[in-house]
Design a protein with these regions (language model features):
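Sensory/regulatory domains in signal-transduction proteins
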Residues: 1-122
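Sensory coupling linkers of modular signal transduction proteins
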Residues: 94-166
Length: 167
């Protein structure tokens, strides 16, 4: 694992399909990819296996509705190391998406979120065993994620997302 420094703010821009079109130097450094390898690659090139598909399903649903989305994310650098971020993703007026990421400042909340993700990954594994396709697994994972968030006392993902915004 390598740490994102408190002063490091980084971004990427993608097209409507999630293919990276722009990235800043901090993103390049943390991901340990060359800029040329990132541009034109799907953003999930940095997806860590500890991230449930349900989290991304929820994100894409929000984005397709024109809403921004915020969440804690575990990313996988090219060298196999992990780096954790708080990501805010928003639709851009002319198409595509902007993802701005920073160091998770609320470590206790981050740890709870990652426990929820762990439970969601287990849930998704069971759904996958039932021969569900990738989209069905992600949709079920998203529903499971929302159930756990409601059990934690939040009425919706939007309420939860607002509560975990870094202050």
């Amino acid at each position: 694992t390598h740490e994102v420094k408190a002063e490091e703010l980084f971004f990427s821009v993608t097209d409507d399909r999630g293919v990276i079109t722009e990235a800043n130097k901090v993103f390049v450094d943390l991901s340990r990819y060359e800029l040329g390898d990132l541009i034109g690659a799907p953003h999930n090139v940095i997806r860590h296996p500890n991230m449930p598909g349900g989290a991304f399903h929820a994100m894409w649903n929000a984005l397709k509705s024109g809403l921004p989305f915020g969440c804690y994310v575990q990313n996988l650098a090219q060298d196999g190391s992990r780096y954790d971020v708080y990501a805010t993703v928003t639709p851009l007026p002319n198409g595509g998406y902007l993802s701005v990421r920073s160091r998770p400042m609320c470590v206790d909340v981050r740890d709870v979120v990652f426990e929820i993700y762990e439970s969601t990954i287990e849930h998704e594994a069971h759904v996958k065993e039932e021969k569900a396709n990738r989209r069905e697994v992600a949709a079920s994972g998203s529903d499971h994620l929302l159930e756990l968030i409601k059990e934690a006392g939040f009425s919706s993902y939007a309420e939860f997302q607002n509560a975990i915004l870094p202050m």
